[in-house]
Amino acid sequence: MPFGLTNAPSTFQEVINDVFMEYLDDFVMVYIDDILIFSRTEEDHFRHVKLILTRLRQHKLFAKLSKCEFNRASLPFLGHVVGQNGVEMQQSKVQALAAWPRLTTVTEVQSFLGLANYYRRFIRDFARISAPLSELTKKGVPFEWGGDQENSFRSLKDAVKSAPVRQLADPAKPYIVTCDASDVGIGAVLEQESENGPHPVAFASRKLSGAEKNYPVHERELLAIVYALKEWRPYLHGSRFVIKTDHH
């Protein structure tokens, strides 16, 4: 398929989805030309790899051997490192964000937030932390770099550098949903117990709308709970879970 065509990525994605339709989310994930095969055992993995390579050959699609990695316990995939213990941020991306120079224009703010936002599921209260920077991207807002923006910039860098490995969800275990609300936004953490105590599965947050900022504290806390239940419905529906909030 020629490069540069507007619909080329979506068309190729549709084709590759059709090729692997019966295997998708069972033991393979595909994004454009990135193919990830995952298995519970080495024996299953050899069988899965053979099925995928056979299907590629049947459709006259070919993988470049030098770009393939086989039988790995973990590997990078779409900016993440995926392994049997969970999902973490790719170190090259962490280093890029940590070394980002001070922002001096709206365009630079947008670029920084664009990359940071991609990893918001690793950062607790991302919406609250990033609020002073995201305000600078609004139409008609003058670019003024002050203490709030500097603190936001540094806090996001620190959060990225200390981001935890997100544990893979275990449907057999109960979940812990911890919710919080501030004057700026609402956020939640989805966790499950592990040998070392509660471990994060995902983080979620968003800013409050103008009307929501006028809610009393207990209603903002309730809003955070409703938001978390909707956000993680695929995990929580039919599962046991506990909700924690700091408002009584």
For each feature predicted by the language model, list its residue ranges.
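RNase H-like nuclease module associated with reverse transcription
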Residues: 111, 117, 214-248
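Active-site palm subdomain of RNA-directed nucleic acid polymerases
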Residues: 9-47, 122, 126, 230-241
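Secondary-structure transition/capping motifs at alpha-helix termini
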Residues: 22-26, 55-64, 192-199, 231-239
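Two-metal-ion RNase H-like nuclease active-site motif
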Residues: 174-181
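C-terminal reverse transcriptase regions that engage the nucleic-acid substrate
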Residues: 7, 15, 23-26, 31, ...
